[in-house]
Every structure is written in C-alpha cells, then in structure tokens.
Amino acid sequence: MFLPQEIIRKKRNGEALSTQEIQFFVQGITNNTIGEGQIAALAMAVYFKDMTMDERVALTCAMRDSGMVLNWEHLNLGGPIVDKHSTGGVGDVVSLMLGPMVAACGGFVPMISGRGLGHTGGTLDKLDAIPGYQTSVDNDRFLKVVKEAGVAIIGQTGDLAPADKRIYAVRDITATVESIAMITGSILSKKLASGLEALVMDVKVGSGAFMPTFEASEELAKSIVAVANGAGCRTSALLTDMNQVLASSAGNGVEVREAVRYLTGEYRNPRIHEVTMSLCAEMLISAHLASDDADARRKLQAVLDNGKAAEIFGRMVTGLGGPSDFMERYDSYLPKAAIVRPVYAANAGFVTAMDTRELGLAVVAMGGGRRAAGDKLDYAVGLTDFIRLGQSVDADKPLALIHAQTEDQFAQAASMVQAAVKIGDTQPQALPEVYRRIGLADL
C-alpha cells in the first residue's frame, strides 16, 4: 500500500521512485484519487530532483498504459507501424508530406498530432484548414483510414494516455513544463499508445525551437531515445535547424498549400525537402523498409516522382471527411486572406539572422494561432515566399508576403517581421538542415 504524500516526499528528498510507486501514482491520476495539488507537488519535485532513466521508462509506460493501447495485429497490415514526432517550430509542415511518403514506401503511419503551442504551429490546426477534414475521430475510424490509406493524422483521443492530459494541464499552470523527464513521458506516452514498432524524433535547435539551447535539445533527444528504446520501441532522433522558418510559409492554410505543391512536385523548398527526406529515410531504415540512407532516399524520390505519395495524401483527406477532389482543386478549397502584400526590409543587405519565435508570433497576432485555449483560428492568414538566411534583400526583393484580413493586421505583422529579420553587410555561413543523428549507440 502506497501513500501519495510519501511518494512525493521521497522524490522531494531526491530519492529514486520504484516502478510500483510510479504505477500507483499514475493510476491515481487516471482514476481521480490523486488531486491536482498532489500532481503539482510531484511535478515540482521532479523538476528540481529529476528522474533516472529507469524512472523515466516506468513513468512513460505507466502513462501509456493509463488508457487504451492500440493493437494492429488483427488488421494484418503487412507492414511496420512507424511514426515521427517533432518538438515543433515555425513553418514545420513536414508531417503532411512525411506521412504519405512513408506510407507509399510500405509503412503504416498512425500519427497522433497536436495543436499550436505558443509560437509554434500545430499540425491539427493546419489540417483544420481543409473543409470537412475531421481531426477528432473514434479509434475504429482511425484504424480504418490507416489500413486503407497507410496514414492518418488525427488528434489525441480521450482514451489514449488520459493520465498525460491531467498531468500536462497541471504542469502548464505550475511552471513545471520544462522538466526533460516529464517532457519525455508526455511525448512518448501518447506515441507509444499508438502501438508503434519504430519512432523517429525530430528535435529542433535554434531561435524557433522549443528547447532554448543546443545542449538542452541534445539532452531531450538523448532522453527520448533512451526511454523509448527502454519501453520497447526502436527509436532514434535527428537534431534539425530552426534558426529560420523551415518551409517557405508559416500559417495554416498557406502551409497546407505548400505541402500539396511539394507532394505534386510543383514546388519543393530545398531546406524542408532535406529535413523531410532525412526523417523519412530514418523511418524507413528503422522500420526495415530500406537497407541504408541511399536506398531509402531512392525509394522516397520514386514515390514523389510517380505521384503515389500525393495520391495517398488525397486518400487520407477523403477518408477523414475532406473533399474527394482535394488534390486536384486544393487552391479553391483552401481559404484566402483579403490582403496579400509584400513586406520589405528597411535597408538593403544580407539576411544574417532571424528571430524565428517572433515570426511565429506574427502569425499568432494575425489570428493564425491561439492566445487562449478556446480561441477560434483564422486559417487564411500567414506568411509566404519567405526569404532565407544568407539571401540578399533590397527595394525589389521582399522579406515575405503577408496574408492578412485587415490593414491593421498587415501593419502589425509587417513591423514584427521587419524586427525579427536581421540585415547586415556580410553574408553569413549557411547552416546545416540536420546537425546530428542520435541513436542508442550515442547514449
């Protein structure tokens, strides 16, 4: 018999908790026998005293098992269950291309995604820009679309990792979000409840990243790789750059438009192409669908070239309630802003740095992201045709196109973009898209 307050005291004093103690506490969170005050106290104790890797594995597994864990065996899919998770950024529309590309190569991708958080865009908010697309469906519909299309991107259902929902809500209002142990548990409990065989983590680094420093990003990546493998899921991580907007656009509808153009071959921004290919290749290798990076990239390029990946995206959209001719007529289905105008730099020169976080907040300021949980979003607003680091700007070459609904919105976004993009006389060195890979051997 355990007492919640004794478990809290033990962690407060810096001792390691047993698997049984962690399971007891998480069960209490799930069945409401442990209150918000006790969750907050344990979260603060963990924030200050941390958790060993064994404790993190126990926490993740207990949170995963707090609800339903999807089982794919009865569907006889004939391919591996594999997924990707990103710590989020600005213009990070990778999931919309990656899911269909991996599915086209023989993987099955049951992707549980989130909404926008702070300055970062949410995959579900982007998909909400597609008329009729349902991000909230029951498990039967989810399984059916994954089986038929090979990929489905939906939101967390109430019966997947319910303990995480309660813990996260408390962490959010008690200044305990930044605990790497608890971030690890929160991310992985939801992902592992999807019944994955392999997972690839995309951990962002730079001015638009969730983690403030390269070292913190690396620490989170190592924690996730260690804990996920400890919980029985083959997992690796890539540290990728978020010192500039990743795609050419940032917003909801504008990013969906870019994803469709990428899949159909109409336009592929080279930076997001490299990040997408790197993550997809890592997934194919992890899922034993490719022998090495070169083999994986060959297969991925083939499904882009032959239209199979684009066709699968269309199938997923239709399966989740969207238009059956979305890929053919995407431009008429996606919302458009009243004002689309360029914003220019105050002086000519090279783009030397970007405050990517501030650029994300410019989209939020126009109504493309939330200030409060219940806010309704404007899916048409955003930024497109974004300048890249190292490129030159002048009176003819704008920083970006702003998609706004009013003149006031345009003016506010324009001044935020101008302040966030630094212009100098010397061209900076190019930054890599992918900094490093972290696998089990790197721990």
Curated annotation (Swiss-Prot):
In terms of Gene3D superfamilies, this protein maps to: Nucleoside phosphorylase/phosphoribosyltransferase catalytic domain, Pyrimidine nucleoside phosphorylase-like, C-terminal domain, Transferase, Pyrimidine Nucleoside Phosphorylase, Chain C
Which family is it part of? Belongs to the thymidine/pyrimidine-nucleoside phosphorylase family.
Q: Which NCBIfam families match?
A: PRK05820.1, T_phosphoryl, Y_phosphoryl
Under which name does UniProt file this protein? Thymidine phosphorylase
The protein's annotated catalytic reaction(s) are: thymidine + phosphate = 2-deoxy-alpha-D-ribose 1-phosphate + thymine
The catalytic activity of this protein is classed by the Enzyme Commission as: 2.4.2.4
Keyword Oxidoreductase included in the entry's annotation? no
Transferase in keyword set = yes
- Out of the domains of life, which is the source? Bacteria
Q: How does it assemble?
A: Homodimer.
First and last residue of the signal peptide: none
* Purpose of the protein: The enzymes which catalyze the reversible phosphorolysis of pyrimidine nucleosides are involved in the degradation of these compounds and in their utilization as carbon and energy sources, or in the rescue of pyrimidine bases for nucleotide synthesis.
Q: Which UniProt keywords apply?
A: Glycosyltransferase, Transferase
Recorded GO MF terms = 1,4-alpha-oligoglucan phosphorylase activity; thymidine phosphorylase activity
- Fetch the PROSITE patterns from UniProt: THYMID_PHOSPHORYLASE
Per the record, GO CC terms?
cytosol
Which pathway does the protein contribute to? Pyrimidine metabolism; dTMP biosynthesis via salvage pathway; dTMP from thymine: step 1/2
Could you mention a single GO BP entry for this protein? pyrimidine nucleobase metabolic process
Q: Top enzyme class of this protein?
A: transferase
